[in-house]
Amino acid sequence: MTTSFEIYNNADFPEVSALWARINRELAPSDMREQFERYIENSINDELARADEAYPQANGSALWVVKQAETIMGTFGIQRITDTDVELRRMYLDGQYRGQGLSRKMLEHAEEHARQQGFHRMILSTAELQAAAVKFYDKSGYELTKIETASAMSNKTVGNNVRRRHYQKILNPTG
């Protein structure tokens, strides 16, 4: 069956919000479930519900859904940070579809889109709780730039002293 990457649209909201919630609940340690629930609510309300503002295509940003037939299997996006930098965001893939090389294809699609938009560098951050993601970015040519302890919640972190790893990758070495 063919897998496609399609630009998110508002009709995708119910399925994508359920996916984001499910994946984050799977990641939540038992002693942080309440904190994760607040994070899920904030992420959906502050980012997904206003995806047109959070990922404006006019400035090179984009949010994609990963589909097979009509089933949404995952999401990923890039947000413009500066004229030269974008941030990889919301790289989520439902567990039943992992291990098939889709994450690599998603990342390659995001990087190629960023290159075509003229961006020089992609940055990202991920919680150390996401061991598979840490390993994936390490293997994908991303350079670790910083490790921090996130004390406050935002739409990028659950807070609660979770350690976050920040990465970068140069997309256009001569750019």
Region locations from a protein language model:
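Nucleotide-sugar-dependent glycosyltransferase donor-binding/catalytic pocket residues
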Residues: 98-99, 129
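Conserved G/P- and acidic residue-centered "switch" motifs that form tight phosphate/ATP-binding loops
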Residues: 101, 118
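Short polybasic/polar patches that bind polyanions
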Residues: 98, 115, 138
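Acetyl-CoA-dependent GNAT
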Residues: 7-89, 94-96, 107-109, 113, ...
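C-terminal "cap" of GNAT-fold acetyltransferases
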Residues: 120-123, 127-175
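Extreme N-terminal starter segment of soluble prokaryotic enzymes
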Residues: 2-4
